[in-house]
Amino acid sequence: MSHMTPSEIVNELDDYIIGQHNAKRAVAIALRNRWRRMQLDETLRHEVTPKNILMIGPTGVGKTEIARRLAKLANAPFIKVEATKFTEVGYVGKEVDSIIRDLTDAAVKMVRLQSMEKNRFRAEERAEERILDVLIPQPTPNNWDKIEENNSSEPSSTRQHFRKKLREGQLNEKEIEINLAATPIGVEIMAPPGMEEMTNQLQSMFKNLAGQKQKSRKMKIKEAMKLLIEEEAAKLVNQEKIKEKAIEAVEQNGIVFIDEIDKICKRGDVSGPDVSSEGVQRDLLPLVEGCTVSTKHGMVKTDYILFIASGAFQVASPSDLIPELQGRLPIRVELEALTPKDFQLILTEPNASLTMQYIALMATEGVSISFTEDGIKRIAETAWQVNERTENIGARRLHTILELLMEDISYDASEWHGKTISIDADYVRSHLDDLVSDEDFSRFIL
C-alpha cells in the first residue's frame, strides 16, 4: 500500500497530467485516507468507510489517465472497468460481480509477484545449484567411496571454480540441457457470456488432471538461469497464504475505477426497462454499499473497497443516475475543458510527451527533429480550433493533428538520414491550415 502524502501523489500525477488540480487532490486524499484508516485501532477502523468519488468532465481531459497513473502509485489491488460492458443479472452479458472477481485475480497476481521477489535470493541459489548439477554431476554414493579412498577434494573445488565462473557470467553463452516444468496444455472452453467463472474452474480442473510434468530443453545458461529462478521462486511460495493476503488486500485497500458511467444513465425521454443501464446501476448498488462476493479464491467483502466513477456527462447528467447510486458517490469533482495553453503544456511538459516521442522515433532513422516554441503554439491552437468547430475530444485531438503533421517526415525518414528538420509555425500552417479551413474535410480527417 502506498505511503505517499497527498502532495506527493499530486506532484507525481503532475508529471503526466496537465491541470485538473481538483481531481488530483480528490484522488490523492482518497488514497491517503486508505493508509490513515489502516493506522486506526480495529474497533474504529470498521466504522470508517471510503468516500467514493464521481469525476465529471468532457472526454480527453485526463479522467482515464488519472486512473492509469493512480494504479501505479497505489501499490494496492486496482482494476479499471468500462460500465458499458455489463448487463443486469439474468441477461446475456457480464455481471457486475465479475468486477470483484477480476480485482481479486489482480490482487493474487500482485501478492504472488511480491512473495516471489522476497524469495528471489533463495531461488537464485537453488537455480545455481541445478545448473551446477548439470555442468558437474554430483557423485553417486559409489563414487563418493572412491573419492574418500583417494582422499581427494577435487569435486568440491571444481564445483566452486565453476560456481565462480557462473556468477561472473563467463558461462552465459554455453548451452546445456535442463529439465523444466512443462506448461500444462490449456483446454479452451467456449462458455456463454456471464459464465466465465464456471469456465475458469473447468480449465483449472483439466490442468490439475494433467499433473506436473517435466520437459527436457536445450538452451543457453543465461536463459536457463532466468527460467529456473522463476520456477524455484514459485515453489517457495505458499499458495494458500497468497490467497489469504490477496483477499485481505482487496477488502482493505482495493480500488475500482468505473469509466463511462454516464453511458448507463437512463434519460427521461427513454421509456421501458433497459438491462444495460438502469439494471446495471441497481446491480452496482450492493457492491458500492458493501456485500460479499464469491470468487474462486474465497469470499470477498466489498465494504471498504474504494469506488471511483467517471463520465463525460455530455448527453446525460449526474442527476440521471438512480438516487441510491448518487448517494453512494458523495465526492464530486468536475474536470475542466482544455484551453490552448493546456494543449501547449501537454505537448511539452509531461514525461514522455508527444513531441518527445516523435523526436525519439525519428532519431532511430538518423533524422533530427526539433519543435520550435511558435510551432508548438500553432499546433495547440489548431487542435483547440478543430475541437471547438467539430466534436470536442480533448487532448486526443493532438494525436490526430501530430500524426498528419509528421506524415511526410515519417514516410521519407529513411531518405533523410543525417538531416535536421525544424517544425515551426510556418511548417504547421503549410501542412494543416488547408485542412482546418475546410470544415467538411476537417470533420472527417481531423
Swiss-Prot record:
Complexes and interactors: A double ring-shaped homohexamer of HslV is capped on each side by a ring-shaped HslU homohexamer. The assembly of the HslU/HslV complex is dependent on binding of ATP.
Source organism superkingdom: Bacteria
Protein's UniProt name: ATP-dependent protease ATPase subunit HslU
Molecular function via GO: ATP binding; ATP hydrolysis activity; peptidase activity; proteasome-activating activity
GO CC aspect terms: HslUV protease complex
Coiled-coil boundaries: none
NCBIfam families membership: hslU, PRK05201.1
Family listed: Belongs to the ClpX chaperone family. HslU subfamily.
Keywords: ATP-binding, Chaperone, Cytoplasm, Nucleotide-binding, Stress response
Binding site for ATP: I18, G60, V61, G62, K63, T64, E65, D259, E324, R396
Keyword field contains Cytoplasm: yes
Localization annotation: Cytoplasm
Pfam families registered for this protein in UniProt: AAA, AAA_2
Species of the source: Baumannia cicadellinicola subsp. Homalodisca coagulata
Major localization class: cytoplasm
Parts of the chain that traverse the membrane: none
Any single GO BP term: proteolysis involved in protein catabolic process
Chain's role: ATPase subunit of a proteasome-like degradation complex; this subunit has chaperone activity. The binding of ATP and its subsequent hydrolysis by HslU are essential for unfolding of protein substrates subsequently hydrolyzed by HslV. HslU recognizes the N-terminal part of its protein substrates and unfolds these before they are guided to HslV for hydrolysis.
